[in-house]
Amino acid sequence: MQKRLTLLGSTGSIGDSTLDVVARHPERFSVYALTAHRNGDKLVEQCLRFAPEVAVVGDAATAAHVEAKLRAAGSKTTVLYGPQALVDVSASDGCDTVVAAIVGAAGLAPSLAAARAGKRILLANKESLVMSGGIFMDAVRDHGAILLPVDSEHNAIFQCMPRDENEHGGISKIILTASGGPFRTREPATLADVTPDEACKHPNWVMGRKISVDSATMMNKGLEVIEAHWIFGLPGERIDVLIHPQSVIHSLVSYRDGSVLAQLGNPDMRTPIAHALAFPERVDAGVDQLDLAQIAQLSFEKPDYARFPCLALALKALEEGGIASAALNAANEVAVEAFLERRIGFMAIAATVDAVLNALPNRSPNGLDDVLAADADARRLAAGFIAKAPAPRVERIV
């Protein structure tokens, strides 16, 4: 039976990759809704190609622009805007599958709506679990939703996991791999001089600017550890991080008998997306087959927490529980935005997050409102710290 998709964040890198896979299998997948924030022109192009029933954008002005262009082209796609519209298309009877690819906290409400509507959720928005892991997973279980991870690391672990629920099938630990980003071998003393363009030059993956910076700080890997904790139900001490510069092994599962299962593939997000879209079947993702002889060498090393303090901060937040992870995520989003706008230096990202975690009293959230309040408090504190931070030492355009 053909799957009907709502694609949240269709104009981003995950959205592009998802639509590439969808286009290869029109007999399997059709598009009910596409959403974007302000990239209206790209959304129009996608709507004209995939003919969704609904398109959602962030504001009225973008909606008017998109609707005018669609009507001029003869499209009948309905154009909506605003946060509630995102929630509505995620819970709509018009779709059975929701690809949650909105970056950041903005993706929480529609992802949670999809869970409460019992949808099949392909989760690329790790912030939903980082901010409200217990609430989100309860919604998945209580409403019969199906959660399939799209992040390459979590999808790799999912593929290496046993399909039964018996004590996780004898699992000892799971191991998330990380490329180490563009600054893995750079002298730590020079990191204060990093520019946004340098931070966004990932050695292996094609990603958006925010997640590229998160990869450079390794905050992305820290968020993925928190995400893995909630998806797979393992404590932080049974989730390891391993630097693997080639990005060929996407993650590993270590079993009690000494066996280690790994998922390998070329670094292309279409592979985990195609796996999740078609699961439990397999379909062509348009990705070249892996040639290990050509790669010749795979290397590994432990992460340097002094070089990557954001990773240490994320692990600490997971250990502390409560609202710490939500505060971590919010402070990081504000700090990364400030860095990309050249208002703070690269190392000030970790300093801002650390300051917020120290300033905000931890507490156990009683519900989503508490999580959102913690998010708002952390953003306010982060903005205050950034306003007092010194300007970047170097302003280079690379």
From Swiss-Prot:
SUPFAM superfamilies: 1-deoxy-D-xylulose-5-phosphate reductoisomerase, C-terminal domain (SSF69055), Glyceraldehyde-3-phosphate dehydrogenase-like, C-terminal domain (SSF55347), NAD(P)-binding Rossmann-fold domains (SSF51735). Catalyzes the NADPH-dependent rearrangement and reduction of 1-deoxy-D-xylulose-5-phosphate (DXP) to 2-C-methyl-D-erythritol 4-phosphate (MEP). GO terms for molecular function: 1-deoxy-D-xylulose-5-phosphate reductoisomerase activity; manganese ion binding; NADPH binding. Signal peptide: none annotated. 1-deoxy-D-xylulose 5-phosphate binds at residues 126, 152-153, 179, 202, 215, 220-221, 224. It is an enzyme of class 1 (oxidoreductase). Its cofactor is Mg(2+); Mn(2+). It catalyses: 2-C-methyl-D-erythritol 4-phosphate + NADP(+) = 1-deoxy-D-xylulose 5-phosphate + NADPH + H(+). Pathway: Isoprenoid biosynthesis; isopentenyl diphosphate biosynthesis via DXP pathway; isopentenyl diphosphate from 1-deoxy-D-xylulose 5-phosphate: step 1/6. Pfam families: DXP_redisom_C, DXP_reductoisom, DXPR_C. Its EC number is 1.1.1.267. NADPH binds at residues 11-14, 38-39, 125, 127, 208. Keywords: Isoprene biosynthesis, Manganese, Metal-binding, NADP, Oxidoreductase. This is 1-deoxy-D-xylulose 5-phosphate reductoisomerase. One of its GO terms (biological process) is isopentenyl diphosphate biosynthetic process, methylerythritol 4-phosphate pathway involved in terpenoid biosynthetic process. It comes from Burkholderia vietnamiensis (strain G4 / LMG 22486) (Burkholderia cepacia (strain R1808)). Belongs to the DXR family. The gene is dxr.
